């Protein structure tokens, strides 16, 4: 039984290289992503911190993509991010979801 009043909606956030913007937005749209938003970003954390704590190397040109997604499509989207965009490899991208419990429209 689904007890989420929003019907299992999640807020997807991902960070990837700017060169992947068009392909990512198209793939998310095809996968059912709604209200897709793209913000250009530049990291400000010191490179040593990222390397020591997470094993990551910072890059200059990034995008932050957010969208709403039906919860039952989450696994498919994460699988697509791994197979098509190689998010399972270091320094390619990071993605996570947050469950939406309430939504005002």
Q: Which residue ranges define each predicted feature?
A:
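Positively charged, small/polar-rich N-terminal and surface patches that mediate targeting and assembly
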Residues: 1-105
